[in-house]
Amino acid sequence: MNTLASSIPLRPHTVAAPPFPLTLVQKLLLPVGAILFDVLFWQERAALSLLLYTVFVVGAVLAGTPKHAAVWRSGYFWLTLLGTLFSAVMVAVVGSGAARLACVASLVIWLGYMNQPHLKLVLFALLTGLYNLFPAVERMGQLLRLPANMGSGVARWWYYGRLLLLPLVTLGIFHVLFAVANPRYSALTNHLWAELGDLLSVLFERLSVPHLLFFLLGLVLTAGCLFIIPFHYLADQESRFGEFVLRQRNRVASFAVRQPDFRTRAFRPLDLRKEYLMALGLLALVNLLLFVVNAIDINWIWFGFHPAPSFDLTQFVHEGTYVLILSILVAMGIVLWFFRRNLNFYQPGVRVLRVGATIWVLQNAVLAVSVALRNYYYIQYSGLAYKRIGVYGFLLLTLFGLATVLLKIWQRRSAYSLVRLNALAAYGILLLLAGGNWEVWMVRFNLQPRFRHVDYGFLLAMPDRVLPELALRAHTLAGRQLTTEDEYGKWQPLAPKTAQQLLARRIQEFRALEARRHWPSRTWADWQAARFFEDQYNLTLKAQSHVAASRF
C-alpha cells in the first residue's frame, strides 16, 4: 500500500568517520612531550628550554615520517627546518625576543609544510600549522575517552582484586613479623616508607590548579605538534593560483574556463585603450614629480649633508621616513593595479607602459636609498635604537618588493607569485633579526666617545647580557650629557654618579637572579655575563688581599 510516508525518501544513515590512525610512537611520545614541556617551561623562561623542546618536536615528527614521503622533496620544508633549528639555537645562545618569535613561527610554519608538502605560501603554511591544533586536540580527546565496554572491564578488575586480597593480607602479616624480628629489615623498610612519603609530599606540594592547567596546555601543544592530521583546504585554495597572468576569455563555454561568465558587460572595446592612456599619463606625471624629488634628495642628502644647528633632525627622519615609505608602497600598489589583467596583453602600447613603470620602480628604489641615508644620518647623530634597525629591515623588504614588481612587469607575474616571494623575504628578514646580538652592538655603538648625549636609561633597560659592556664603559660616562625617560615620557637629566649607582644595582640584581635560575632558563650570553662579573669579583678580591699583604 502506497502512502505518503512511504513515498518520502529515507535519510541515509551517516556513519561516523573512523579516527585518524596514530602510531604507537606518537601515543608514547605524547605524555613524554607533555612532561618535558612541564619540566622545561613551568616557572621558567624560554631559553635553553625552547631549544630542547623544539629538538624534541622536530625529532619526534621526523622519526614518524616515512622515507618516501613527499615532504622530503619540498624545498620549503628544508628551508623552514633549517630556520627552526637556527632560531632555536639562537634562543639558547642570545635569548632575544626576535629569536623566540622566529623559533615559534618557524616551528609552526614547518609543521604546516609537514601537513601539506605541496604548499608554497608561507602564510598558508603558518595557518595550516595553527589549524592542525584543533583536530589534534579532538584526536587526543578520543584517546582519553573511556571505552564503551567499561562495565565489563570494571567487573574483571573486581574479580581479580578479590583473588589478590588474601595474598596481600598474608604478605602484610609476614612483613610485620619480619620487621619485629629483624632490626635491619625494619630499618630498611622504614627508610623506604619515608622516601615514599617524601616523594608524595613533594608531589602534592607542587600539584596546584595553575600547574595542572599548565600541564594540560603542554599536553595540548604537544598533541598539536606530534599529531599531523591532514588539512587540505588552504592547499586546495592555493592550487587555483598561478605564477603568471594568463589571458583567459570568460565568455566561452569550454572545459578550460573554470567559471564562464555570460553576463552583459559594460566594458566597451575602446575602454582598454582609455585605461592604457590613463596609465601612461599617470606614469609620466609621477615619474616627472619623483624625478624632481630624487634630484633634490641627491643634491641635498646624498653628498655633503650637514644639518644646521637649528635643524630638527628628529622630524626630518621620523615623519619624513614614514611618509616616503608610504609613498613607495602606494607606488607599488598602483603598478600592481595597472598590470593586473588585460594591459599585460595590450600589444600597441604594452612595451611603452613597461618602460614607464620600470623607470618609476627604479626611481622608487632611489627614494628608498634616500630614506636609508636619512636613517643613517640620524644614527650618526643620536645612536642606534630598535626602530632605526627596523627601518633598515623594512627597506630591505621594500627593495626586494620593488625587484619582484619588475618581475611582474616584464614576466607577467601574478599577484600570488609576488606574495609568495615577498613572504619568503619577510621570513628571511625575521631569521636575520633573530641571528643578531643587537642590544650588545647598540651599547658598543652608542657609547662611542663621539656621542656626547646618551640616552642611558634606554641602555639600562636592555636585557642582562649587555651589563658587561656597560660595566666596561662605565668610566666613559664622565663629561657626557646622560638622560633618561620618566614614566610620563619626559626626558630627565641623569648625573654620571647616579648612572653608575643604577648600573651597580642592575649588576647586583642580575647576579642574584642568575644564581636563582634553573638550567632550563639559562642562555649562553647570560652565562657569559655572570662569568664576567664573577671573574671581575675574584680579581677585586685578589687585588684587595695583595694590598693588605703589602702593608705588613
Predicted regions and their residues:
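Hydrophobic alpha-helical transmembrane segments in integral membrane proteins
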Residues: L430-Y456
